[in-house]
Amino acid sequence: MPKNILVIAALPEEADAFHPGQGVIAQTEPHPMRVIEQAGRHIKIVTCGLGKVNAALAVGRYADADTALVAMTGTCGRIAEIEGDTFWITRAIQHDYGALGGERISHYRAGDWPMGEARDPAFTAMSDPGSGLPHATIISGDVFLECPTAANSLAEKLNAQLVDMEIAAVAQAAEALDLPWCAIKAVTDSADGESAGDFSANLKRAARKAAEAMERVVELAAKW
């Protein structure tokens, strides 16, 4: 019965924040990977790099027949009013996938044929096992969003509160492999003109908040 867990993080700071200093370095290339033994299972923590392609490649490369769960920990931007700073992700949408007509994109579920009637574009995470976190929908795309006008438009159109560059691709890859997925993200910035500075200033603090919450979820998963 599969029992191991694959934890994906985009950045070294996000990966290092998960059980910091524990485990062994299994490899440094092409993706840094640390392995922790916990409750009779292996937890692989992989740094995938930025963007949807890197995220999906990491899932495809490191999820195997012994993988029970694909998880992502890390940071994000806030694009709509929502209380809290660390969130259990319930739905993930690729905001740059679809059909572009004029200056307007019609969003489709990533991988679907982008013509005709579109179904719900969101990938749905596994049920929250008891994280105690507020729930949110996140959108992912291969851009660092620092425009409040674009952020507000996407938030309204896709009924989303958060943005990052990877989770929806992790979700798509996990679903293709018939694996459950989950994600926890902590906010660094507000996807506006101050985002670059705010992200840098808040990265390590937010990464640790997300990682601490993911550590608790992984402990809960040990009881499955």
What would you call each of these model-derived segments?
Residues 2-60:
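N-terminal short beta-loop-beta anion/metal-coordinating cradle
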Residues 6, 68-71:
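Structural motif
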Residues 43-48, 137-140, 184:
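Active-site-proximal beta-strand elements of phosphoester/diester hydrolases
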Residues 61-65, 79-82, 172-180:
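Alpha-helix C-terminal capping segments
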Residues 76-158:
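Mid-sequence, gly/pro-rich, charge-dense loop/helix-turn segments that line enzyme active sites
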Residues 143-196:
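A C-terminal functional module that forms or caps the active site or interfaces directly
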Residues 179-181, 186-224:
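Regulatory input/activation interfaces that engage signals or partners
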